[in-house]
Amino acid sequence: MAQKKEEAAATPAAPTAARLQTLYHEKVVSALTERFKYDNVMNVPKLKKISINIGVGEAASEPKLLETALQELSQITGQKPQIRKSKKAISNFKLREGQAIGCRVTLRRKAMYEFFDRFVSIAVPRIRDFRGLPDTSFDGRGNYTVGVREQIIFPEIDIDKVPRIQGMDISFVTSATTDEEAFVLLTELGMPFKKKNN
């Protein structure tokens, strides 16, 4: 009997799906299929990745700002950020080619759904004077980007330890071919867009 308990404890538990991932498979797929009349389930749009980018233009004169941005982005996403470097020199901005100007994290699979859930459930409601996210930031190919002005909306960031308020861009990349499909997909997943006045 004790041996069976040890064997059961030794086998790792099956990974659990994120809440929104389960919601997508159980409800969103059928809602999108009904709305857009897809012939095949594989044609139903899905969230492919989320990219979070923080630009730190002053990193050349103040390298500590880039270190802070890296640390905060790591706390928010749970992944190590990549340092973004300038592709060309721009003398007006005192920018040299290859100079660090920001950082980025790309989330996929379970981490992506967990971040999306935290973003719409916890972070977005903490935005000051929030009345909904704009629905005008689609790129024409089914991807949506939103700018966040303050990193302190994320609960992982301690407001007392923040040296300065820093914004970021969050891009939601979908497999949708049109903005309408992407809008419905993100709405079904819980994205709080502005209500349209009739």
From Swiss-Prot:
Task: Give UniProt keywords alphabetically.
Answer: Ribonucleoprotein, Ribosomal protein, RNA-binding, rRNA-binding, tRNA-binding
Annotated GO MF terms: rRNA binding; structural constituent of ribosome; tRNA binding
Q: Which Pfam families match?
A: Ribosomal_L5, Ribosomal_L5_C
- Cellular compartments per GO CC: ribonucleoprotein complex; ribosome
GO biological process terms, alphabetically, are: translation
What role is this protein assigned?
This is one of the proteins that bind and probably mediate the attachment of the 5S RNA into the large ribosomal subunit, where it forms part of the central protuberance. In the 70S ribosome it contacts protein S13 of the 30S subunit (bridge B1b), connecting the 2 subunits; this bridge is implicated in subunit movement. Contacts the P site tRNA; the 5S rRNA and some of its associated proteins might help stabilize positioning of ribosome-bound tRNAs.
Q: Which NCBIfam families match?
A: PRK00010.1
Family stated for the protein in its record: Belongs to the universal ribosomal protein uL5 family.
* HAMAP family linked to this entry: Ribosomal_uL5_B
SUBUNIT field: Part of the 50S ribosomal subunit; part of the 5S rRNA/L5/L18/L25 subcomplex. Contacts the 5S rRNA and the P site tRNA. Forms a bridge to the 30S subunit in the 70S ribosome.
- The name on file for this protein is Large ribosomal subunit protein uL5
Native source organism of the sequence: Chlorobium phaeovibrioides (strain DSM 265 / 1930)
Gene it is expressed from: rplE
